[in-house]
Swiss-Prot record:
Stretches for region SNAG domain: 1-20
Name listed for the protein in its UniProt record: Insulinoma-associated protein 1
Protein keywords: Developmental protein, Differentiation, DNA-binding, Metal-binding, Neurogenesis, Nucleus, Repeat, Transcription, Transcription regulation, Zinc, Zinc-finger
Record localization: Nucleus
Gene3D superfamilies with a match to the protein in the record: Classic Zinc Finger
Function: May act as a transcriptional regulator. Plays a role in noradrenergic neuron, pancreatic and gastrointestinal endocrine cells differentiation during embryonic development.
Family designation: Belongs to the INSM1 family.
Basic residues bias (residue ranges): 1-12
Basic and acidic residues: compositionally biased ranges: 19-28, 89-98, 292-302
Amino acid sequence: MPKGFLVKRSRKSPPVSYRVREEEEPRGESLPGWMLLATMCPTGGAPPPCSPDRATQAPCCSSPRPPPAGQFGNPDTVQQALYSPTRPVSREQRERKYLGSPVSAESFPGLGTSSEALLYPPTGTANGHHGLALLPPVSSSSSVSRSQGKRPAPEPDSKPAAMPGTGPGATSSSAPSKPPAAKKTKAIRKLTFEDEVTTSPVLGLKIKEGPVEPPRPRAASSGPRPLGEFICQLCKEEYSDPFSLAQHKCSRIVRVEYRCPECHKVFSCPANLASHRRWHKPRPPVASTAQAKEEPLSDRDTPSPGASESGSEDGLYECPRCARKFRRQAYLRKHLLSHQAAKEPEEPGVMMFPGEEQRAKSPPSLNAQECHPCPVCGETFPGKSSQERHIRLLHSSQLYPCKYCPATFYSSPGLTRHINKCHPSENRQVILLQVPVRPAC
């Protein structure tokens, strides 16, 4: 690139035009002094613009006449002096200057003929007649912009203007300008949702295994493409939203069942099955606790035999004589006493208490705390058998026998309590029979 090719432009560029001095131009050639005076003091009248005929006759008018002296010194005709030292240029010098410049010759080849009247209007009558023109004091950038705005349309046979740097006079160092690169569009990342063939830890669900294949290309005639890539990896079906894809996947999930081997109940979680099977294990018998609860009942005034109504089919305690089952061991003991009382009646007129013979054979207890008082007269006896014999012999009229079993009680409330507990399904009017009937008024 030659020295001075790039010109630093400021906001106010100096009115100096770029020109290349040719070698054949004489160094000592200078303009006459009257041209400088005409430039500093132009006349107010503006002649008509130069015609193309005058442009062709411009080389013949090489010796201009001096302007009349009357134009100088007239205050009315003198305009404001120009502050920029612009020198007038003849047509030959203008053509040599702009055609010699590589920028003007290459960029604006038709500038000398098409815009000569615009760039170089005549400033006076004398100068216009002699074919002289004055260059206005403008910068190179403003002159180029004005010439481009006011330049007439080229004729059809005219050649298009060459781009800078492509003409024959262009320097090899000037690189051709490249068109602006198109803005790269941001690559849209496609969202792919691939299924992981795993086993779900929730409720024993297991996903069917299937070969994972790359997604198939979508057909152009299948309608608009869904917003997201929601594709099932098992059957390669596309869905427009994740909810539809989730509903489709639920149909492909296999439910694992956990069945109880004893009752064949189905569970979906192995932990639920384990907690269920604990109920099938047999519980330890509670006979010891039931016996401890029934001990106070056996120490009643009169032992009552087992009731027939207490037997049930689902009982755990079975009688060895009649094959009846009882839910509690105390009920079975009372029932066995009834069998013994039916076998050993000693006195036909006196009712025997069940188990009296066995109790009589047992050695009497000499402990003072084991004395049994009579509920009628208050006499104490060392054993239960002697107490019962005393009551049977002396207080037989005050006994309350049970109507439904051979048990005998010493008071009406005791008999009522026995019937309500051991004979709930029988007729309870037996309580009313024990009450003496009042005489009618």
